[in-house]
């Protein structure tokens, strides 16, 4: 037996790679991932050790002792420690939830995007599943108060439908089963995406498409060694990101295709940024290795330099598979790696009951009427089911598989064409099966009313709004999408923006590319609540319309100085104003009056400046501070006044302090809020040099 990779050894032991990695860690065997090698001698030792453990595990075990009182008490204490909050239906807003759980909004936004791939906005009205994800992240239980009567504005039944599946995933984990992974193939134009899918499906799709470039979206399912994989074929990555922006994630794994004779190109970078923003596992397929000028090692180097993807064989954690889609070389290994990643990520579903699915394509067919291509996520979709989508409803009249053969049922991860909707459903929306056609109609009508009511309030972040947003004190993040006319301009933009980095605010460049601002850029900005900055480029008409529709702020500039100045103003607006104390006057207590039902009042001679009724005062006695606080009342003779200036006399009652003596010195001051400027990297470096 020659040396083996960890996942190959796992097969021999009839274990999953994940289980074997855990066992190896307990045994003290140092391996990095499922792709790491184990030599023959070590493999034999591991096999012997694990087989011995299995034998011991099969032996009858001694009866377990009942838990002692201390253990029971400890469990009760632990349960009590778990925090629980109650929310009303109208409290499903990010700012309210942040206040209730004691975590700043910006911290929640950052954690949810980085750890769970969910893009949120300050003050956003949240879906139930988004609330549950937030509370799950911070280990807090939730209880939604039920109300006897709820209006259209208070409850979205689509959220309740989604919650049904969330609860199934939480409460019935033992019923979840593995499902086929859904894979999106991305990459630069002409790098071989369609040819790869063609090779996998063993059909000649590429030859029928104009110029060999994909012109339509489709989903296909193939079988590999008895296991199924579903592939979404998309022109570019607009579908992928638009689906994410609308909350309908269908993709489990991304295969990033890079040509070995061309290397990492602009659309490769763009595709990678979209996949990275979605927090989806990425497998790199280096294609066209059969070409004479193919250079796999150089391509790997570009993956490291341009994308930060380090291949596993170089000590990183990115699976890179050299292939030739034309000859088929390496394709079997790629499929094997897809199944391995699916197994490692434990892709599962709830296999029974009413189905939910994601629409990936929809249109109005002259003969068949409204049709939709979808991928089933959970349950079983059947002919005759009553269904709802975001904007329409219907009853499933016909189902067709990816080869356009009529079927009666569709199962998780299966691509299917659905006929029977009343109208063309929104692309990238979720589909749910409900109990009846009447209920479906009621749900959608209420949904449309709700969306219409919210339409005016729906908007994303723009540069001006950043001046009012997120006034918490933790570090803030601004997501940027940059487009410029040349790579030199992109480099100049990045350099200028990096100089605006500060301790208080992080500028996160989600994507930077060359060429006009497209719909793909807009959808990416919508997904991450980012701002698009263009330098010497135009916005195409379709992207402009989409930006207006999605509420994405798009700015274009011809002078880099103006872009930087606008950004500086926005960053300054993100910082909470600084409170600065300003001394406005001094005085001395010349007489102390005792007034019944009032207490002690100081007769004060103003020495300089003024005393402000809405300001503050400090009292010094023999050089020592004896009081600092507010002025309760300020009088000039018998009149209440707001200000007394030197050299006038006045009567002052101090808030909560009566221990005043003649001769006490007074210092009057006010607190002013001063606009705070970030300390930019460049300015900080200059100061340090000085």
UniProtKB/Swiss-Prot annotation:
Residues 287-290 are annotated as: G4. InterPro entries: EF-G-like_DII, IF2_II, IF2_N, P-loop_NTPase, Small_GTP-bd, T_Tr_GTP-bd_dom, TF_IF2_bacterial-like, TIF_IF2. Residues 324-326 are annotated as: G5. One of its GO terms (molecular function) is GTP binding. Residues 178-346 form the tr-type G domain. Residues 187-194 are annotated as: G1. One of its GO terms (cellular component) is cytoplasm. Belongs to the TRAFAC class translation factor GTPase superfamily. Classic translation factor GTPase family. IF-2 subfamily. One of the essential components for the initiation of protein synthesis. Protects formylmethionyl-tRNA from spontaneous hydrolysis and promotes its binding to the 30S ribosomal subunits. Also involved in the hydrolysis of GTP during the formation of the 70S ribosomal complex. This is Translation initiation factor IF-2. It comes from Thermotoga maritima (strain ATCC 43589 / DSM 3109 / JCM 10099 / NBRC 100826 / MSB8). The gene is infB.
């Amino acid at each position: 037996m020659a040396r083996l990779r960890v996942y190959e050894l796992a097969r021999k032991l009839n274990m999953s790679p994940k289980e074997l990695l855990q066992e190896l860690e307990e045994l003290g065997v140092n391996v990095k991932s499922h792709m790491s090698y184990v030599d023959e001698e070590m493999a034999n030792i591991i096999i012997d050790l694990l087989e011995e453990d299995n034998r011991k595990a099969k032996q009858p075990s001694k009866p377990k002792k009942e838990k002692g009182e201390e253990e029971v008490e400890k469990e009760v204490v632990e349960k009590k420690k778990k925090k629980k909050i109650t929310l009303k239906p109208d409290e499903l807003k990010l700012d309210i939830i942040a206040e209730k759980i004691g975590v700043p909004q910006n911290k929640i936004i950052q954690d949810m995007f980085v750890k769970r791939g969910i893009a949120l906005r300050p003050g956003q009205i949240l879906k139930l599943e988004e609330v549950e994800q937030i509370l799950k992240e911070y280990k807090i239980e939730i209880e939604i108060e039920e109300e006897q009567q709820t209006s259209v504005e208070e409850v979205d039944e689509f959220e309740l439908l989604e919650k049904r599946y969330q609860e199934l995933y939480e409460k019935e984990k033992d019923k979840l089963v593995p499902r086929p992974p859904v894979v999106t193939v991305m990459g630069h134009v002409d790098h071989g995406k369609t040819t790869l899918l063609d090779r996998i499906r063993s059909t000649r799709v590429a030859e029928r498409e104009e110029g060999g470039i994909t012109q339509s979206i489709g989903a296909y399912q193939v079988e590999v060694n008895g296991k199924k994989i579903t592939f979404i074929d998309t022109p570019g990555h607009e579908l992928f990101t638009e689906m994410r922006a609308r909350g309908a994630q269908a993709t489990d794994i991304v295969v990033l295709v890079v040509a070995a004779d061309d290397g990492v190109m602009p659309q490769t970078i763009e595709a990678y940024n979209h996949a990275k923003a979605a927090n989806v596992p990425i497998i790199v397929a280096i294609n066209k290795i059969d070409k004479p000028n193919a250079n796999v090692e150089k391509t790997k180097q570009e993956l490291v330099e341009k994308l930060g993807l380090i291949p596993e064989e170089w000590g990183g954690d990115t699976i890179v598979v050299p292939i030739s889609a034309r000859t088929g070389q390496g394709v079997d290994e790629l499929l094997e790696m897809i199944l391995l990643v699916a197994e490692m990520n434990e892709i599962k579903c709830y296999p029974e009951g009413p189905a939910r699915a994601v629409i990936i394509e929809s249109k109005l067919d002259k003969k068949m009427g409204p049709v939709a291509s979808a991928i089933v996520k959970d349950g079983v979709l059947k002919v005759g089911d009553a269904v709802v989508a975001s904007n329409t409803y219907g009853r499933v009249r016909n189902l067709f598989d990816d080869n356009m053969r009529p079927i009666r049922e569709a199962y998780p991860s299966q691509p299917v064409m659905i006929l029977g909707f009343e109208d063309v459903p929104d692309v990238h929306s979720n589909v749910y099966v409900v109990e009846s056609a009447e209920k479906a109609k009621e749900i959608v009508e209420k949904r449309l009313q709700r969306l219409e009511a919210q339409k005016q309030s729906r908007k994303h972040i723009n540069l001006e709004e950043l001046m009012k947003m997120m006034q918490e004190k933790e570090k803030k993040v601004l997501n940027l999408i940059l487009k410029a006319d040349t790579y030199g301009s992109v480099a100049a933009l990045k350099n200028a923006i990096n100089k605006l980095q500060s301790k208080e605010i992080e500028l996160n460049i989600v994507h930077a590319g060359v060429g006009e601002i497209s719909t793909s850029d807009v959808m990416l900005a919508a997904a991450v609540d980012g701002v698009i900055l263009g330098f010497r480029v135009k916005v195409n008409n379709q992207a402009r319309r989409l930006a207006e529709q999605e509420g994405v702020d798009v700015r274009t500039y011809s002078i880099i100085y103006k872009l930087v100045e606008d950004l500086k103003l926005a960053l300054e607006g993100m910082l909470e104003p600084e409170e600065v104390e300003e001394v406005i006057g001094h005085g001395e207590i010349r007489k102390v009056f005792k007034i019944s039902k009032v207490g002690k009042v100081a007769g004060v001679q103003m020495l300089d400046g003024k005393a402000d009724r809405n300001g503050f005062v400090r009292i010094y006695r023999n050089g020592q501070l004896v009081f600092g606080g507010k002025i309760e009342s300020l009088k000039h003779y018998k009149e209440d006044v707001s200000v007394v200036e030197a050299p006038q006399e006045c009567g002052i009652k101090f808030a909560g302090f009566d221990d005043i003596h003649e001769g006490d010195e007074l210092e009057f001051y006010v607190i002013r809020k001063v606009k705070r400027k970030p300390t930019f990297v460049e300015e900080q470096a200059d100061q340090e040099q000085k």
